[in-house]
């Protein structure tokens, strides 16, 4: 079972962790948007090549990345400053969205295995 199937996910940061989370969420059937403060992060070409359906946004991490959208979860790369991501994280929490990172994706994957396959 793909527990993220059809869910719109926002990934903050396109470093190694952000790319890994994006790949995982795509495998799970999520609709994805990736945001990075850099206009052309090093992994942007990899993202476009491997996952051309993923939307990329550059610029500051602001609340309108999620407000008025269908985003249901926000995952943050661990290398990002919490101060930098705060506007998006606060808005996501206020909207009741799932907020996390690589570890929370891993934990949820294990919970899904336990629920669906008695793992």
Predicted segments — roles?
Residues 109-117:
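Conserved adenylate-forming
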């Amino acid at each position: 079972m793909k527990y993220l199937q059809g869910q719109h996910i926002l990934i903050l940061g396109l470093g190694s962790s952000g790319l890994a989370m994006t790949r995982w969420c795509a495998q799970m059937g999520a609709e994805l948007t990736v945001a990075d403060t850099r206009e052309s992060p090093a992994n942007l070409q990899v993202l476009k090549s491997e996952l051309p359906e993923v939307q990329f946004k550059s610029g500051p991490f602001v609340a309108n990345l999620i407000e008025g959208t269908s985003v249901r979860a926000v995952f943050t790369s661990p290398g990002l400053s919490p101060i930098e991501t705060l506007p998006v994280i606060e808005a996501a929490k206020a909207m009741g969205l799932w907020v996390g990172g690589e570890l929370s994706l891993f934990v949820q994957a294990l919970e899904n295995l336990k629920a669906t396959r008695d793992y």
